[in-house]
Each structure stands twice: as C-alpha cells, then as structure tokens.
Amino acid sequence: AIAYPMALPFISMLIPRGPGNPMEQPKDAQGTGTESGIQPQYGVPYGVTLNPFLSPFGLPCKQPAWGYISALDLKTNDVVWKKRIGTPQDSMPFPMPIPVPFNMGMPMLGGPISTAGNVLFIAATADNYLRAYNMSNGEKLWQGRLPAGGHATPMSYEVNG
C-alpha cells in the first residue's frame, strides 16, 4: 500500500453557529470551502476551523520534514520505503525565490495514482511538480514542472483500453 504521512500539526477549533457560520448551506454558495479556514459542516451544530500550526512569520512550528511518500507491507505492517517529498520552492509565506529546490518534505493536498507498470504518480505538494516513483523501492524516476501546484490525484489512461 502507498501512504503519504504528514508530520505537520494543525489546529482545529469548533465554531458555534451564528452569523457567518450558518447551519444550512446558502442557496448561492459555490463549492464546499477550502483546505484551511472555516469548514462549514452544514447540518450540524458547529463548524470547524482547520489551520496549520504556524509561527508569527507564517512558518510551521515543527522542524521539517513535514511530508513523506511511503510504501507499506500490509501483511507484515512494515514500512518498505519512506522518502521525503516536496520542496519549499513555491510555498514560502513571502516572495523568496529559492533557485535550487531541495527535498525538504512538504505537506500534501491530494493523492497518488499507481499504474500497472509499477509507477506511482503524485502532484500533491505545493511546489508545482508532478513526480513519478518506482513503487517497489521509492526511487524517483522523473519529475516535471507544472504551471501551478497539482493539489489533486493525477489521472491515467490506458491506450486502447
């Protein structure tokens, strides 16, 4: 099995219903919210805020690494391999170009997809890369730059499928 554990603390707070936090979804509402901030959870007595635990400078209050990609053996419960994934290249809280991306291990929003060819694709980090890994050993096979962060599970097609 493939997992992408995150080691970044988040702060969640229950928010009672009231102005700005209605019980029912407004008729003109678009979408369901964002990854952070207030999560409406319509139909229940409380909403919830979800935000990373950050310093006043906007940086996490825990040292890196924050994100990994790993393979698990479901029969033995062993971690087969575990690699840091993601760079801070496109996710600094203020404009700071980092010319040489270094693999720090960043939080992810999105998931991987695996193929019959034993290749795992993932674009869930905020550093605007799509990456391919060998599922057997975790070796990075390829990475390509995206115009923006993927934050989603890639899609795969089969020729003549």
Where are these regions (language model features)?
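Beta-sheet-rich non-transmembrane sensory/scaffold domains
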Residues: A1-G161
